[in-house]
């Protein structure tokens, strides 16, 4: 009996020793939740969150920097109840239940909001908000879940915007990227405010204050965006906006706030890069080359953008009433092939050829029923010879195509196949060359892609790739047609399937601009330059241009750049050539280049061949004018550009590049 008692005491002593583990050794966040002076406090070792339960206002104390968010406001919750849209306020919930919340890997608060009312009407809805510190860096993870009963959520602004006195500048992936000082003298607006459009190529933004920074990273971006304001002289207000999906907020929405004691827009971009790598979204060019050797031929190659037939329908806003000859301009396939042969004689040994206007009635006409190839230009035989010429010259031949614009005179047009909006209407426009059009539901696009490219290959046309217009620049669509419903998430899946089909057929996949969702599906884009006022076609830059996109994805996708001054997406009075160099992108090449253009193209190609597969590790401004800048790549290569003096320096220097004419 005595021996048994000794043994039992030994076991108890051993268990006590083994369970006395330091909290820091478990990986469990060392975070405490408590109430203090009427506020809820979430305290970690680095960061402290204060929540005022009366107005849901939050303040974050992050290692010496305070980030204050605005309070709940009227309209931060929009619902539909009995067919009416109602503006509510989260903080006006008749009942707020706030309790500590701990999952073992994140710790904070759960806030359950119920008993909403609008005038004398009770709104049957529950909103649950979660605020937690997570991970060693104690990032603030905010999650919103709606339990919709008789009322549905149309949009919600939460967490609220960071107050203007908490930051000096705002960082936005507005096209390639924008740094916007709070007191910027000119009005700034985003072209669109939904994720995956030009306003937000990538689903994040951030703010800088002195040497500190905060990143707002949307982890569920498909039905999300922002509200953005910057009047003349500022200040800037940028706020997260959650959007319904087919009329409901039907899945949890999550955003992560990352705090940097010492950091700026480069650190934000690198944190986001780590995020897309961790979730498997980042697909490098090296991986794409491994999957398709044709992609390797694009590294260090110029991009030749040319066309066959430009035909403008009378209904189009581009129609030339006073000069009808401009409405139908044709160059044959054979003529274009000869121009490529002459270009090759100037020393161009490889290139990516993007061909517009090859379809039956030319550029932006009759989609998705574009076959047969333009009869006036040579038809099937002419297109086949053009493709063979590209093969012989070592050029990668790809066609321009479109599977969103749905022309009313297309052979397959049926109004029942268009997008149906929530209010029961169908989109209609007549801007583009083909005239009257609607929008094809994304669920139906893949069948047309298969139809057309299978036919091209069956006719012996050696097309090596395709550019599917607008897919990677227009935010995702919704469709409410019960025959082919599609959420925004569905839309992106269907667009991706179209691009993946091209790659499965051995082709290079391309689209218009580099919206983040498309990175795993495409190899290059038409361009990814900067936001200008009043539009990207021409004008001064909005804010200060910075290469946010390339800081994340330079080694995942190829971006071509126009060379001229004030070209599309290039700030007026600045050389596209210098922007192309500092971004180490591909150059555009005209069909009849002079010596200066050829020299510029060869320099850009040589630089891209050196670093095109490498990460852009750094971007920096070298003086207060923001005109002298430097980028650094993973091998140590630096590119320094002075936009004022129109000079550049590449270090280490590129090998001597001589004329090959």
Q: What do the PLM-derived regions correspond to, one by one?
A:
Residues 33-34, 40-353, 358, 365, ...:
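Carbohydrate-recognition beta-sandwich/jelly-roll modules
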Residues 25-30:
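Short, Gly/Pro- and small/polar-rich lid/capping loops
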Residues 44, 246-268, 316, 321-324, ...:
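Active-site-proximal substrate-binding groove within the catalytic cores of carbohydrate-active enzymes
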Residues 296, 301-448, 459-466, 470-484:
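Aromatic-lined carbohydrate-binding/catalytic grooves of carbohydrate-active enzymes
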Residues 1-4:
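Positively charged n-region of N-terminal signal peptides that target proteins for export
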Residues 6-13:
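Bacterial N-terminal signal peptides
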Residues 18-23:
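Boundary at the C-terminal end of the N-terminal hydrophobic targeting segment
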